[in-house]
Amino acid sequence: MGIMTSLRQGDVHRVTAETDVLVRVGLDGCGQCNVSTGVAFLDHMLHQLSSHGLLDLEITATGDTHIDDHHTNEDVGIAVGQALSQALGDRRGIHRFGHFVAPLDEALVQVVLDCSGRPHFSYGLQIPSQRIGSYDSELVKEFFVAVVNNSGLTLHIRQLAGTNSHHIVEACFKAFARALRMAIEIDPRRAGAVPSSKGVLEQAGGQKS
């Protein structure tokens, strides 16, 4: 992997009997992306996340894609979620909340999220086709479930319009990227304080900051 200079950075290496995944995320980046998961459509969506979220993202993965893409897709999501949580740390100084509505031609998708430390996922995509190229459309939900459970995000995804499966999913990733970018950016008025009236936010895994 290349050199990353982001001040807020997460590095995760996940190895199982099914996959070997290495993820590096820089929150204060400019959208540099070097991704190779062996799942072409997932790579395309991760490029959207990096580009529109201004995340520096490096991911390499090998897995049992000769069976199907499920394990690689899920384990990449797990590692991305863990890397995000690691990079956010105690979440001091961030805006915390983010929202965005992204269009792609006829598709329109809304994403609202909270870097709360409490994982919750509400999913409202209605993808008309079972596959997008060779990618199983059900894996979109599984990717975000893995990210949410390992990052501690509260994430709501709503499809407002759309008939083309590729457009719907790409609009979703773009909206997620922009909402995440809004939430993780530093708020200078907070002066480094935790963005919670309790003075503390939980990190993924239930560890309080």
UniProtKB/Swiss-Prot annotation:
InterPro entries: IGPD_sf, ImidazoleglycerolP_deHydtase, ImidazoleglycerP_deHydtase_CS, Ribosomal_Su5_D2-typ_SF. Its EC number is 4.2.1.19. One of its GO terms (molecular function) is imidazoleglycerol-phosphate dehydratase activity. Pfam families: IGPD. The keyword Cytoplasm applies. Belongs to the imidazoleglycerol-phosphate dehydratase family. This is Imidazoleglycerol-phosphate dehydratase. It comes from Prochlorococcus marinus (strain MIT 9303). The lineage of its organism: Bacteria, Bacillati, Cyanobacteriota, Cyanophyceae, Synechococcales.
